[in-house]
């Protein structure tokens, strides 16, 4: 009976981790594709220039693949050490995510202030050599969200030391339109505009977060159940 339970949990655990591993492959693939084809689209942050979407996806995908591989191998080999390693790695990720979420909600105001300050510092790198990614990122955001600057279009005045903005701030794009009168520019601040957009899509973000947590809890349950079954089987055989 113990052996039958072990086999059932074993194949469930393997199937779960195979999907987990394939998901990691997908995330890694998207990250590599972004790095190869959209490498010029990088971070908006001046403090964390390597914190681009491509780099985050590559790191996340590789880590998920590694965890999934350990889980698959542990399930097939019925290895207690690998199963426990998988459990601890997944638990560490789960606790890290929970800690980040708690800190984010606890220090929302401070994070808001720091983010705006950092983004304003990043504006001074706009259009400079070696910062094509940041330049393109700002151009895309201002065009798509119909906004200008971090907290106001006047943020750009400090960058240019003149009454002008990038052409991506213009209501109707044309060459050097950023030199025209303020009435021809978007007035909405980009930080608040993007923040409102995220709040409007909070339900989708919440559902994604909940699904991620449930998948991780399921993985933890499978790992610990199989670990216990392997221990029981070893005890029974002994």
UniProtKB/Swiss-Prot annotation:
Residues 35-55, 107-201 are extracellular. Residues 1-13, 77-85, 223-238 are cytoplasmic. It is found in: Cell membrane. Glycans are attached at residues 152, 161. Expressed in multiple tissues but is absent in brain, lymphoid cells, and platelets. GO terms for biological process: protein-containing complex assembly. It is a multi-pass membrane protein. GO terms for cellular component: focal adhesion; plasma membrane; vesicle. Keywords: Cell membrane, Glycoprotein, Membrane, Transmembrane, Transmembrane helix. Changing residue 67 to M: In a breast cancer sample; somatic mutation. InterPro entries: Tetraspanin/Peripherin, Tetraspanin_animals, Tetraspanin_CS, Tetraspanin_EC2_sf. Its main location: membrane. One of its GO terms (molecular function) is integrin binding. The chain crosses the membrane at residues 14-34, 56-76, 86-106, 202-222. Pfam families: Tetraspanin. Forms a complex with integrins. Interacts with HRH4. Structural component of specialized membrane microdomains known as tetraspanin-enriched microdomains (TERMs), which act as platforms for receptor clustering and signaling. Plays an essential role in migrasome formation and migration on retracting fibers at the rear end of migrating cells. Migrasomes are cellular organelles that form as large vesicle-like structures on retraction fibers of migrating cells. Mechanistically, acts as a membrane curvature sensor and participates in stabilizing the migrasome structure in a late stage of biogenesis. Belongs to the tetraspanin (TM4SF) family. This is Tetraspanin-4. It comes from Homo sapiens (Human).
């Amino acid at each position: 009976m113990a052996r039958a339970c072990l086999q059932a949990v074993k194949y469930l655990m393997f199937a779960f981790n195979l999907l987990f591993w394939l998901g990691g492959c997908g995330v890694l693939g998207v990250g590599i594709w972004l790095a190869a084809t959209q490498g010029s689209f990088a971070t908006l942050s001046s403090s964390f220039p390597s914190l681009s979407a491509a780099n985050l996806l590559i790191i996340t995908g590789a880590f998920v693949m590694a965890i999934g591989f350990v889980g698959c191998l542990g399930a097939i080999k019925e290895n207690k050490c690998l199963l426990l390693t998988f459990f601890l790695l997944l638990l560490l990720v789960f606790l890290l995510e929970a800690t980040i979420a708690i800190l984010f909600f606890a220090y929302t105001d401070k994070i808001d202030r720091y983010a705006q300050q950092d983004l304003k510092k990043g504006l001074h790198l706009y259009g400079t050599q070696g910062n094509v990614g940041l330049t393109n990122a700002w151009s895309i955001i201002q065009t798509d969200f119909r906004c200008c600057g971090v907290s106001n279009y006047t943020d750009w005045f400090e960058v240019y030391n003149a009454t002008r903005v990038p052409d991506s701030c213009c209501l109707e794009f044309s060459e050097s339109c950023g030199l025209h009168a303020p009435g021809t520019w978007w007035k909405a601040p980009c930080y608040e505009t993007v923040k409102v957009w995220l709040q409007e899509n909070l339900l989708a973000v919440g559902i994604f977060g909940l699904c991620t947590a449930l998948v991780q809890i399921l993985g933890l349950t499978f790992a610990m159940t199989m670990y216990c079954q392997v221990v029981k089987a070893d005890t029974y055989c002994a």
